[in-house]
Structure formats: structure tokens, C-alpha cells
Swiss-Prot record:
<keyword id="KW-0150">Chloroplast</keyword>
<keyword id="KW-0507">mRNA processing</keyword>
<protein>
    <recommendedName>
        <fullName>Maturase K</fullName>
    </recommendedName>
</protein>
<dbReference type="GO" id="GO:0008380">
    <property type="term" value="P:RNA splicing"/>
</dbReference>
<keyword id="KW-0694">RNA-binding</keyword>
<dbReference type="GO" id="GO:0006397">
    <property type="term" value="P:mRNA processing"/>
</dbReference>
<dbReference type="Pfam" id="PF01348">
    <property type="entry name" value="Intron_maturas2"/>
</dbReference>
<dbReference type="InterPro" id="IPR024937">
    <property type="entry name" value="Domain_X"/>
</dbReference>
<dbReference type="InterPro" id="IPR002866">
    <property type="entry name" value="Maturase_MatK"/>
</dbReference>
<keyword id="KW-0819">tRNA processing</keyword>
<dbReference type="GO" id="GO:0008033">
    <property type="term" value="P:tRNA processing"/>
</dbReference>
<keyword id="KW-0934">Plastid</keyword>
<dbReference type="GO" id="GO:0003723">
    <property type="term" value="F:RNA binding"/>
</dbReference>
<comment type="function">
    <text>Usually encoded in the trnK tRNA gene intron. Probably assists in splicing its own and other chloroplast group II introns.</text>
</comment>
<dbReference type="Pfam" id="PF01824">
    <property type="entry name" value="MatK_N"/>
</dbReference>
<dbReference type="InterPro" id="IPR024942">
    <property type="entry name" value="Maturase_MatK_N"/>
</dbReference>
<comment type="similarity">
    <text>Belongs to the intron maturase 2 family. MatK subfamily.</text>
</comment>
Length: 507
């Protein structure tokens, strides 16, 4: 990031967030082709990239774009989007990629200033997805209720333009953003890219993520402000603060008026034990309070989205779960708090009394039904969970078929290694093993018994992870000890995500 900082510094006219002139900068298109501001593989001093990335080409692209739009409008074409609508259009695609880099500059400058003079801790497991579960076990074990909210997405592109207006005051950039959104945009396909009609979300994932995160950040900004100030403000009186233009000036004025005339109607509405987590288009709000208060927060979210962001949302999109009775689906796990407390025996000093401490255990189990549904969509089994063959892989070699099954099985084993109950994971691994055997049997036109007899027991050893294989050799003679150890919860913190079974269209 430091090597690009000199290129991100704006001149006098751009210090007011005038980003439109950056479209004519050569390095913007070089950064767009590199698909990242923090990669070290690109050298801006090297002029090795082709002529498409030059500043003169950028000017020509914009000129040709507007000329074609003018010709389409003047000719009164029945399909005015024929120039913009094609995914393979070079002009609009390159400008949009460059614009995606430009709109990130204000946020990148804030990140650089924030990290200036600070040394980041280097750790291989710093971004591990499993670092979230210790947070759940430490903080959610003493909570009672969880509000599971499905974050709605805006159906009007103009809402995103208004959100972006809070960060950038450049009218030209706002008009260009509005143009791209109205020509390309199909927001219903952003959350589910498989149902995409236009090529916006699939061909421009970087721009999509920026718009979605900026939209979610706005509602979270208001939520955190009102949540922190809820002990001083009435919920019905805080509507004047929702507009972000001159936000802090309105806050100062409102606090002054509130201190003079509304001190007698304070409404205590603050929860010190509340935790908020957002992931994959959903949000979790956990609290120790009563269901009545959680129900108030539920309708608060609905009213905030409908009346301020003009986004349609229904109360049924938010579910209140009791951690003692219900489970929450979080990142591929079914998490819940165990009813029976876990007793931990401790001893402070030698020859002292033994103390039994009752602790509430937070369990994370593998959701068997969603996993079987995923395997069914990928055609590894039928809806009942019975393994079937994979005929689409019949043209591959035997080693390639086995490697693909083993890779999926190992990834699932690593990802769900920390589950408190392994029985569901054993069922999933069994489906993949038998599906692999049936795929090979169908390819060679043989039977399962004959095929397994020819391969031997070494065939199933490939499905074991490296950790399982080592432990099975160590505890091969002590089956009880090995079985008890394998049932324990072991997190493999180098696993970031499952990249095989998430996208079903790969199979």
C-alpha cells in the first residue's frame, strides 16, 4: 500500500473528493488490471502494459462511450442498451474497472492514515475464519436470546447513489455511478450471482462488493450511534439525526436542545451485554435481555430500513432464537448453548479442597440437513442421503476422480473439525466415499464388491486428513484412546473457507 500512496494523493482540486479526473490517469487502469491495491507483483514504473491502459486511451474510451450513447438516443433505437448491455464490450468494461478503483480511493486514504506509524502483527492464522468461534464461546455462553436478521438489499439504484454522496461530493463521479447502475444493474442478482441476468455482479465483483459494503455500513453507522446513545436519546426523537449530511452539526444542536428541554423524559434503553456480528448478508444481535426488548430491536431494524433507506423489509426476515432451545446457523455450523452445564473441577493449592465450577458450554454442530441438500445439488447423493455416482466425471482418469473426491472430503473435514458432535460429519464423509466408489464402478462397468476387492483397504486411507492419518498410526493399537481423542474439538486455524462445495455450478 505504501508504494501506491503517492499515486493516491490528490492534488488541490481533488482534495475535495473530486475523483472524476482520475479516470484520465494511466495508473488507474494498471491498478484495475492488477485487481488490487496491495499486491506487489505490479510495477508502475514499468511501461510494459499494453496501450489499452494509457491515459489517451481512457479519454478515447469515455468519448466513444458518450458518442455511442448519443447516437443511440438520437436514432430512437428500440434497444438503447445494446452498446452497454453486452458483457464483452471493451469500452464500458474498462471504464467500469477503472471507476471501481477510483471509488475506493477515499476509503484507502483513510486506511493508510489509520495504519500510519502502526506495525501490524504478522500471523499466518490472523484471518482465520475459526477465530470467530472462540469469540462465540467466550461471549455468547452467558447470553439468552439471539436475533437472526436477513439484511435486505436495495431495489433502487438511486439509494446507492445517495449513500455514496455521503463520502464523495464530486457531481461528475455521482453521475457516472448513476449511469453505470441504471445501465448494468440488477440488484436481485447481487446476493445470488447464479441468477444474474446482467454481467454486472459476475464480471465486476469488486465494484459489487464496494457498493454492498458501503450500503451496509450506512445502516450500521446509524445503528451503532443510536445504540450507544440510547441511554440519552428517545428512539422517537432521533429521526432528525439520520441524515448524514452535516451530521455532527445536527448532533451538537440536538444535544443542546435536548439538554435544555428534555431532561425529564429520559428513556433508558441500553444493553451492556449486546453483541453484533455480520456475515454473508445476515446479522446476529445477541443479548441477555428479555424477549420483549429483542422484539423491539427487531421492529427497529424493519422501520430503519423501510423509512430511512426505502428498502422493503418484513418482520418475518428477523427471527428471535433462544439459545437454550434453538440453534443459530452461523458459517456452516449450528451453534447453541448446552442446557446441561459443564462441570470443571479445579484445585487452588495442593491438599486443598476440590472446587466444582459449573460452566455453560457453547456447542457447534454440523447441520446435516443443509449439508445433504448441498450434496444433493452437487449430485453426490439423492434427497434421502443415499450416495450416487458422478457420471459427469466419467471421462476423467481414476486418479483425477479420486483426487477430487478426496479434496472435497478433506476440506469438509478440516472446516468442521471443531464441531462438538462428529456423527453428522461421519455421515457426510461416508456419502462422499461411496459416491467415489460408485463413480469408478460406473466408469469401469463393474460391481462395488469386485472393485473394492481389487483396490483393497488402502483406498479409504486417501480420504483421511494428514492429522487423522498420523493419529491413526500412533493410536492404532489403542482404539479406545484414539476414538476418544478424535471426538475432541480441534480447530485447524489455517482453514479460511470451503471453496469446493459452496459453488454448486463447479460440479
Amino acid at each position: 500500500m505504501e508504494k501506491f500512496q503517492i499515486y493516491l494523493e490528490l492534488d488541490g482540486s481533488q482534495q475535495h473528493n473530486f475523483l472524476y479526473p482520475l479516470l484520465f490517469r494511466e495508473y488507474i487502469y494498471a491498478l484495475a488490471q492488477d485487481h488490487g491495491l496491495n499486491r506487489s507483483t505490479i510495477s508502475l514504473e514499468n511501461g510494459g502494459y499494453d496501450n489499452k491502459s494509457s491515459s489517451l486511451s481512457g479519454k478515447r474510451l469515455i468519448t466513444l462511450l458518450y458518442q455511442q450513447i448519443h447516437l443511440s438516443i438520437s436514432a430512437n433505437d428500440s434497444n438503447p442498451n445494446q452498446f452497454i448491455g453486452h458483457n464483452n464490450n471493451l469500452y464500458s468494461q474498462m471504464i467500469l474497472e477503472g471507476f471501481a478503483v477510483i471509488v475506493e480511493i477515499p476509503f484507502s486514504l483513510q486506511l493508510v492514515s489509520f495504519l500510519e506509524g502502526k506495525e501490524m502483527a504478522k500471523s499466518q492464522n490472523f484471518q482465520s475464519i475459526h477465530s470467530i468461534f472462540p469469540f462465540f464461546e467466550d461471549n455468547f455462553s452467558h447470553l439468552n436470546y439471539v436475533l437472526d436478521v436477513l439484511i435486505p438489499h436495495p431495489i433502487r439504484p438511486e439509494i446507492l447513489v445517495q449513500t455514496f454522496r455521503y463520502w464523495v461530493k464530486d457531481a461528475s463521479s455521482l453521475h457516472l455511478l448513476r449511469f453505470f447502475l441504471h445501465e448494468y444493474f440488477n440488484w436481485n442478482s447481487l446476493i445470488t450471482p447464479k441468477k444474474s441476468i446482467s454481467g454486472f455482479s459476475t464480471s465486476n465483483p469488486r465494484f459489487f462488493l464496494f457498493l454492498y459494503n458501503s450500503h451496509v455500513y450506512e445502516y450500521e453507522f446509524l445503528f451503532f450511534f443510536l445504540r450507544n446513545q440510547s441511554s440519552h436519546l428517545r428512539l422517537t426523537s432521533s429521526g432528525v439525526l439520520l441524515e448524514r449530511i452535516h451530521f455532527y452539526g445536527k448532533v451538537d444542536y440536538f444535544v443542546e436542545v435536548f439538554a435544555n428541554g428534555f431532561q425529564d423524559i429520559l428513556w433508558l434503553y441500553k444493553d451492556l451485554f449486546m453483541h453484533y456480528v455480520r456475515y454473508q448478508g445476515k446479522a446476529i444481535l445477541a443479548s441477555k435481555d428479555t424477549p420483549l426488548l429483542m422484539n423491539k430491536w427487531k421492529y427497529y431494524f424493519v422501520n430503519l430500513w423501510q423509512w430511512h433507506f426505502h428498502v422493503w423489509s418484513q418482520p418475518v426476515r428477523a427471527h428471535i432464537n433462544h439459545l437454550h432451545k434453538d440453534s443459530i446457523n452461523f458459517l456452516g455450523y449450528l451453534s447453541s448453548r448446552r442446557r446441561n452445564p459443564l462441570v470443571v473441577r479445579s484445585q487452588m493449592l495442593e491438599n486443598a479442597y476440590l472446587i466444582d465450577n459449573a460452566m455453560k458450554k457453547f456447542e457447534t454442530a454440523v447441520p446435516i440437513i443443509p449439508m445433504v441438500e448441498s450434496l444433493t445439488k452437487a449430485r453426490f447423493c439423492n434427497p434421502l442421503g443415499n450416495p450416487i455416482s458422478k457420471p459427469i466425471w466419467a471421462d476423467s482418469s481414476d486418479s483425477h476422480i479420486i483426487d477430487r473426491f478426496v479434496r472435497i472430503c478433506r476440506n469438509l473435514s478440516h472446516y468442521h473439525s471443531g464441531s462438538s458432535k462428529k456423527k453428522s460429519l461421519y455421515r457426510i464423509k461416508y456419502i462422499l466415499r461411496v459416491s467415489c466408489v460408485k463413480s469408478l464402478v460406473r466408469k469401469h462397468k463393474s460391481t462395488v464388491r469386485v472393485f473394492l476387492k481389487r483396490l483393497g483397504s488402502e483406498f479409504f486411507q486417501d480420504f483421511l486428513t494428514e492429522e487423522e492419518h498420523v493419529l491413526s498410526l500412533i493410536f492404532s493399537r489403542a482404539s479406545f484412546t484414539w476414538r476418544r481423542l478424535y471426538r475432541g474439538r480441534v480447530w485447524y486455524l489455517d482453514i479460511i473457507c470451503i471453496n469446493d462445495l459452496v459453488n454448486h455450478d463447479k460440479f
